[in-house]
Regions:
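A short local loop/turn or secondary-structure capping micro-motif enriched for an aromatic residue
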Residues: 131, 162-163, 196
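Solvent-exposed, conformationally flexible loop/turn segments
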Residues: 148-149, 181-184, 207
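A contiguous, surface-exposed recognition patch within enzymatic or periplasmic domains that forms
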Residues: 2-151, 159
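Short, hydrophobic/aromatic beta-strand segments
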Residues: 2-8, 168, 197-201
Length: 207
């Protein structure tokens, strides 16, 4: 036919210094060949969504899946600052983390690819669930296709988050986190767009 492979990912480089936590909702991650593994806890007990706990093996490539969410992001706990990304899941289901690796194998790229700000990581949004490779034709995870005279259009947004001690969920209007401690849970909210009127919070039917 006339269809041609279509492949689109948006890539942002972010710093890794500052106790970085990746807020990527999901229960599994895909490798490039379609292999599925546990997320966010890896073998044996690594918290893969914490940059500093990826200090094993070589580079990491996590295509996180398993939850139909329209957001993901990251948070530097030492800085009290983070970022979020939103898009309709049907438009951008792919969300990927790339880590060069914390061993000398990976950290050599800090010298080769950066200036003086330290190592970086990549966070990416994609039109597909993973970045497939040649053997992916044997899996459900393949390149998409685009027909002649067809146009694809979508919207995605990036925004800052501050003072929430992490990100549990985000929309185009606000981001929030629930922080446990001292026998209670604290709701922390960061407005992304102007918010007016009453904000009603419910839990198990209680206001």
């Amino acid at each position: 036919g006339w269809d041609r492979p279509a492949y689109q990912w948006m890539n942002a480089g972010i710093k890794t210094v500052g106790n970085l936590e990746y807020s990527f909702p999901g229960v599994r991650y895909l490798e490039h060949d379609g292999t599925s593994r546990h997320w966010p806890t890896g073998y044996p007990d690594y918290r893969l969504n914490r940059y500093e706990e990826n200090n094993h093996g070589h580079y990491k490539s996590y295509h996180v899946t398993g939850e139909y969410t329209d957001f993901w992001g990251g948070y530097w706990h030492d800085d009290g600052f983070g970022f979020g990304h939103t898009a309709e899941y049907a438009d951008k289901p792919g969300k990927k983390i790339w880590i060069w690796g914390l061993s000398p194998y990976g950290m050599i790229w800090e010298k080769l690819l950066t200036d003086s700000d330290g190592q970086y990581s990549e966070v990416q949004s994609g039109r597909l669930l993973n970045q497939s490779i040649g053997t992916s034709y044997r899996t459900p995870f393949k390149h998409g296709a685009l027909s002649p005279y067809v146009t694809n259009a979508w919207s995605e947004r990036w925004f800052p988050v501050r003072g929430t001690d992490g990100i549990l969920y985000a929309t185009d209007e606000l981001a929030f986190n629930i922080v446990p401690g001292n026998g209670q849970q604290t709701l922390k909210i960061y407005a992304i767009a102007p918010v007016s009127g009453e904000l009603l919070v419910t839990s198990d039917g209680n206001k």
